[in-house]
A protein has these predicted regions:
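An exposed, glycine/acidic-rich loop-and-rim segment of catalytic or binding clefts
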Residues: 1-290
Length: 290
């Protein structure tokens, strides 16, 4: 089922709403402010519902937030070096909001806008956003949507997040979902004892400003090798991670691009909650909230 409640009011008087979807195995709360995921509750090893994402209790927290808690980031996530890019022979200038670089498409973020509710059912909700030509500095008008859907097949809680984007000309589109997960439960401490298995043979190195260098490097023999499972805290102080102050890197998904398949498993050491992540994207960013 789905319920709707008021989540707060913006300074211009617009009302923001919170939508909660639940079934026997999972409970999800999302808001039309940024199409943001606010709460995600699943049962721990004792059957207790546990919120496994970080977030705020009210709208004011999200208005002030600059950490992208639960946001859908776009039009282009992560960093664009020099806050500019060239497409079809034309150079486009973006806002430099991370030193000389553009981060998460700049300060005029999709996460600070009210999205329309395009559709909803007992188990899903779709938000949509119209992004005009040259919005954030990107060419082309864009119709964007994100759908959250919950299920409990075989009594296992599941959440799917689906993006659809329809531009009217060539542009950059690289969306990501930016929830911060703590599988022991939000507020329970750090995630250094979370064990992560990541099916990726390569990663993309970054420079001193965390901008990708354009290289694709093997994970073999490095702290980036999660293929056989690794605790996040094992090498968190390694010298190769000091620029980013931890993990904040992109791993290359070498097979199955375009078809959803499991690429990552993470497990909380206290709760017994384990999360499988599947994607049809060619890359996955692992960030330890440095």
């Amino acid at each position: 089922m789905i319920t709707t409640t008021d989540f707060g009011t913006l300074c211009d008087g617009r009302t923001v709403r919170l939508y909660t979807l639940k079934n026997d195995a999972i409970e999800l709360s999302v808001t039309d402010y940024g199409s943001t995921l606010v709460r995600l509750l699943v049962p721990d090893k004792n059957g207790k519902l546990t919120d496994i994402v970080l977030g705020y209790d009210d709208l004011a927290g999200y208005v002030a937030d600059d950490t992208c808690f639960g946001n859908n980031v776009g039009r282009s996530a992560n960093r664009i070096g020099g806050a500019s890019f060239t497409l079809n022979g034309t150079e486009y200038k973006l806002a430099a909001n991370d030193g000389e670089n553009n981060l998460h498409s700049g300060p005029d973020s999709y996460s600070k806008r009210i999205w329309d509710v395009a559709a909803k059912t007992d188990t899903s909700i779709t938000f949509s956003l119209e992004s005009p030509h040259m919005d954030q500095g990107f060419p082309g008008a864009l119709t964007m949507s994100v759908t959250y859907e919950i299920s409990d097949q075989n009594e296992e809680p599941a959440l799917s997040i689906t993006y659809e984007a329809a531009p009217d000309q060539d542009t950059l589109i690289s969306m990501t979902h930016h929830s911060y997960y703590n599988l022991n439960g939000e507020g329970s401490g750090n995630i250094l004892n979370h064990k992560v298995t990541l099916a990726a043979d390569f990663f993309t190195p970054t420079d001193a400003a965390s901008v990708p260098t354009g290289e694709i490097t093997s994970v073999t023999g490095t702290v980036m090798d999660f293929r056989d499972g690794r605790y996040l805290g094992t090498d968190i102080e390694d010298s190769t991670l000091q620029t980013a102050r931890g993990y904040d890197h992109n791993w290359v998904i070498g097979t199955g691009y375009g078809v959803p398949h499991k690429v990552l498993t993470a497990t909380g050491d206290q709760s017994g909650i384990s999360m499988d992540l599947s994607t049809d994207y060619p890359g996955i960013q692992l960030y330890t909230a440095n």
